[in-house]
Amino acid sequence: MSVVSAGIAGIGAASIKAFTELDEGYDTIVTKTGATGKALEGLTKSADNVFGTMPEDMSTVGEAIGEVNTRFHTTGTELEKTSKQFVQFASINGTNVTQSVDQVDKIMKAWNVDASQTGNLLGLLTAKAQETGISVDTLEGYVLDNNAQFKEMGLSLPQAINLMAQFDANGVDSTQAMAGLKKALQNATSEGKSMDEALSDTIGSIKNAKTETEAMQIATELFGKKGAAEMTKAI
């Protein structure tokens, strides 16, 4: 085969591969959304727009477009913006884009977070993961699993994310620590205190304790025996 022929063959193979990748991305959109006709045309156009501005394969872009459209019910520029955010989030954190959209969507619904705050939430999750070393998948799971308790305690979503990241960074067993926090809420309520007041008073007392034994005694009074050790370690 001549050099020219080999070059033409190479271009042909590359074109076929590129077409196949695009087709796979479009197929993913159809599978995830069930869209047809003009609705599908709009989604594939958005996929093309995202794909043309990011160093990602079309399969990943198709996943993002399909999942974001299905869960956030957005189209056009808003769909493209949010899809880009999730593609970048997944790339930075080494996660699956479909799982990322799924988990974050559940968190936002559980906490009634407006879709306009998606970028801020993704940024916070990424920042805490980078600061503490916890994987975003694990962090998201912790926040989802304990969201009812967090809301009962009056903690905001950013506070909950930060708390669980710090637990992990300090080697604290989150299950035991949450048991301690639940006990703290019960004690605070019985004494007519708010959760913030009870935690603030106790943390100050634990930090200022003269001995580890004294710190443990103080923590036990508020967090209970099961959670005292973990909470003292965290504080």
Where on the chain are the PLM-derived regions?
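Extended alpha-helical or coil "stalk/linker/tether" regions that are enriched in polar/charged
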Residues: Q159-I235
